[in-house]
């Protein structure tokens, strides 16, 4: 029987199958951070349980960390408490931790791939919605809640129902100045922020085949913004080249055996998909969100849509509400709107390739005097590499602040926040109300 990539990974990880309900899947890699794990560890202690597979569990500090000072006390008392608790939990349960003093610390969805922890065919979970990032390697990766974090820590398994299969084929030649972020924003805008609900989405097509791993990670990172459980891209030679000689990647004979297995990880020719979509990006322009939902997106040269012309009452009201919150008017250009902040970073766009692209545009230019702009590398490895290439000097000369790694302005959970009513042009993945700070407009 022909199978999709998702079905192959799901079926190969079944520990107990219940065809009428949820099956139990084995989890290959469990990623942790300081925010969603404390309660799970407390529950383990209360039930006198141990971590089942500490070698398949990995932790880092990213959500709360300061990007200006390498000190856990720099982000406030609550953040400090969470980070101290993570240190204690990892020591007690023998879990490897990249804390802020570790030379490899960074955003969890950046460091796991760059270290070779993320491998094709794996099941990967984390208490973070953008775990779908790892699907770029042909891994079934998704976010879980705190009670599920506890369950995986205790059993290395998780109950999961089967999701439907969606295929999105991306075709055409990528126009100049268009990036992977533009492509996925366009798809979200075209299909809607709930279009992926109930599905695991496999992205394919010539455009995907020609993308780097960094670009593929951006695509899968934002599959969750369509409501999908996860995003997947079949591994290929680009994947193998990226993974070879990484610290946690297989080596020697194990590498050859892994390659043989990974080459099997693709959807069969006649595999059935519940939904198929083809997207042509040949005439695509750079995209930008104008509202408070990722599907409220337009081309940079388009006007904000007139909500009075929207047929759906729900979408019409949503657009009207977004305009009011954002302080915008229909039929106006975003290029005429003044901004207060610029943020380059997050698990969507903080890898070395992203920083190279941004630096090319900024070279020999200066930002407006009233704008505060920051660059937050996704990891210390990315930071070191960028500094070796002189990218930090380009950003600094342009007027940006060059920061330490962390989630930073992607979410208002640390000191990097947008002031009330402030506007930020952000490379992150969400533009929800208050996402970057109370009253902030992304």
Curated annotation (Swiss-Prot):
Gene this protein is translated from: leuC
Enzyme class: lyase
UniProtKB keywords: 4Fe-4S, Amino-acid biosynthesis, Branched-chain amino acid biosynthesis, Iron, Iron-sulfur, Leucine biosynthesis, Lyase, Metal-binding, Plasmid
GO function term, MF aspect, one: metal ion binding
Cofactor: [4Fe-4S] cluster
EC number(s) reported in the record: 4.2.1.33
Pathway: Amino-acid biosynthesis; L-leucine biosynthesis; L-leucine from 3-methyl-2-oxobutanoate: step 2/4
Superkingdom per UniProt: Bacteria
Protein name: 3-isopropylmalate dehydratase large subunit
Subunit description: Heterodimer of LeuC and LeuD.
């Amino acid at each position: 029987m022909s199978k999709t990539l998702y079905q192959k990974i799901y079926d190969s990880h079944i520990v107990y199958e219940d065809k009428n309900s949820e099956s139990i899947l084995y989890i290959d890699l469990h990623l942790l951070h300081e925010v969603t794990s404390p309660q799970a560890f407390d529950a383990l202690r209360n039930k006198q349980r141990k971590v089942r597979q500490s070698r398949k569990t990995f932790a880092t500090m990213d959500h709360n960390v300061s990007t200006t000072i390498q000190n856990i006390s720099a982000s406030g008392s609550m953040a400090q408490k969470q980070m101290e608790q993570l240190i204690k939990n990892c020591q007690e349960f023998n879990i490897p931790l990249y804390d802020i003093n570790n030379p490899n610390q960074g955003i969890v969805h950046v460091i796991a791939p760059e270290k070779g922890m993320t491998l094709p065919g794996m099941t990967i979970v984390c208490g973070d919605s953008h775990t779908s990032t790892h699907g770029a390697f042909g891994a079934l990766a998704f976010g879980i809640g705190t009670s599920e974090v506890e369950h995986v820590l205790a059993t290395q398994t998780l109950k999961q129902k089967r999701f439907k299969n969606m295929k999105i084929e991306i075709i055409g030649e990528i126009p100049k100045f268009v990036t992977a972020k533009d492509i996925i924003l366009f798809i979200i805008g075209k299909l809607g922020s709930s279009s992926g609900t109930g599905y695991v989405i496999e992205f394919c097509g010539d455009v995907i085949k020609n993308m780097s791993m960094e670009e593929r990670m951006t695509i899968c990172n934002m599959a969750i913004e369509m409501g999908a459980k996860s995003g997947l891209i079949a591994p290929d030679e680009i994947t193998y080249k990226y993974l070879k000689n990484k610290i946690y990647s297989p080596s020697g004979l194990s590498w050859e055996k892994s390659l043989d297995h990974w080459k099997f990880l693709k959807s069969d020719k006649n595999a059935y998909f519940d939904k198929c979509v083809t997207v042509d990006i040949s005439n695509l322009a750079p995209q930008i969100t104008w509202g408070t939902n990722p599907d409220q997106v337009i081309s940079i040269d388009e006007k904000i849509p007139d909500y009075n012309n929207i047929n759906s009452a729900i979408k019409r009201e949503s657009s009207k509400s977004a305009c009011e919150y954002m302080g915008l008017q229909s039929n106006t250009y975003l290029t005429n709107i003044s901004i207060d902040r610029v943020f380059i970073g997050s698990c969507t766009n903080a890898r070395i390739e992203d920083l190279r692209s941004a630096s090319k545009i900024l070279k020999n230019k200066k930002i407006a005097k009233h704008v505060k702009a920051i660059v937050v590398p996704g990891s210390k490895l990315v930071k070191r590499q960028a500094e070796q290439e002189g990218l930090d000097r380009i950003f600094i000369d342009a007027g940006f602040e060059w920061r330490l790694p962390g989630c930073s302005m992607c979410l208002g959970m640390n000191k990097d926040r947008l002031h009330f009513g402030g506007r930020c042009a952000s490379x992150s993945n969400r533009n929800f109300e208050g996402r970057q700070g109370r009253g902030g407009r992304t």
